[in-house]
């Protein structure tokens, strides 16, 4: 190509895109769907009966390269059971000022308690507001779930929870109501027996 055509070739890209319709995003009003597998805000999941999946093992905190996760485990008791195992995550914090969204914490979780949602709007005017505590990370309770602490489902073990056998809360059978006692019907006098 001759040297004097160089500037014209350079402006060729500009001229070809100058008359195209721009792809404008009206972001706050119209939100585009995220791609499948998008790494957004974390979520602590629950079992179908409402118990937490987190067992407080701290593997997610060890796997985090940015040191953004802090977990304190505590022991479950028979009076207060938050997860089906021996332990649960009493304190769970994720610092989104440090989180890089890599997902290594999700891969390290042995009970699939930690997942990443598609939620990406995590802005705050306060730095402390970007340190998410356990109450902001827990999945919301569904209508058929019971808020912990509560006992394991009757007739189940910890292994049933870990194997995924606890899928839905069984409908509570209504206790059989005894029929109200009916007063004995009054007998009509029998003329043959009353002789």
UniProtKB/Swiss-Prot annotation:
Pfam families registered for this protein in UniProt? Fer4_7
Reaction catalysed by this enzyme: a quinone + NADH + 5 H(+)(in) = a quinol + NAD(+) + 4 H(+)(out)
Q: Give membrane topology per the record.
A: Peripheral membrane protein
Q: Where is the composition biased (Basic and acidic residues)?
A: 184-195
Q: Where in the cell is it found?
A: Cell membrane
Q: How does it associate, per the subunit comment?
A: NDH-1 is composed of 14 different subunits. Subunits NuoA, H, J, K, L, M, N constitute the membrane sector of the complex.
Q: What is this protein called?
A: NADH-quinone oxidoreductase subunit I
Q: Which organism is it from?
A: Rhodococcus erythropolis (strain PR4 / NBRC 100887)
């Amino acid at each position: 190509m001759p040297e004097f055509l160089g500037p014209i070739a350079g402006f060729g890209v500009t001229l070809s895109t100058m008359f195209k319709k721009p792809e404008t995003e009206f972001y706050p009003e119209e939100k585009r769907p995220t791609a499948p597998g998008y790494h957004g805000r974390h979520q602590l999941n629950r079992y179908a009966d409402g118990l937490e999946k987190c067992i407080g093992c701290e593997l997610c905190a060890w796997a985090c390269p940015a040191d953004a996760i802090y977990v304190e485990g505590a022991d479950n008791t028979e009076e207060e059971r938050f997860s089906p195992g021996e332990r649960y995550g009493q304190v769970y914090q994720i610092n989104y000022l440090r989180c890089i969204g890599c997902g290594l914490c999700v891969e390290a979780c042995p009970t699939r308690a930690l997942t990443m949602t598609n939620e990406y709007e995590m802005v705050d005017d306060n730095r402390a507001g970007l340190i998410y505590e356990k109450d902001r990370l827990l999945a919301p309770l569904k209508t058929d779930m019971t808020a912990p602490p509560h006992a394991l489902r009757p007739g189940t073990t910890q292994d049933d929870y870990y194997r995924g056998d606890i899928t839905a809360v069984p409908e509570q059978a209504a206790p059989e109501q005894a029929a109200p006692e009916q007063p004995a019907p009054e007998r009509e006098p029998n003329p043959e027996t009353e002789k």
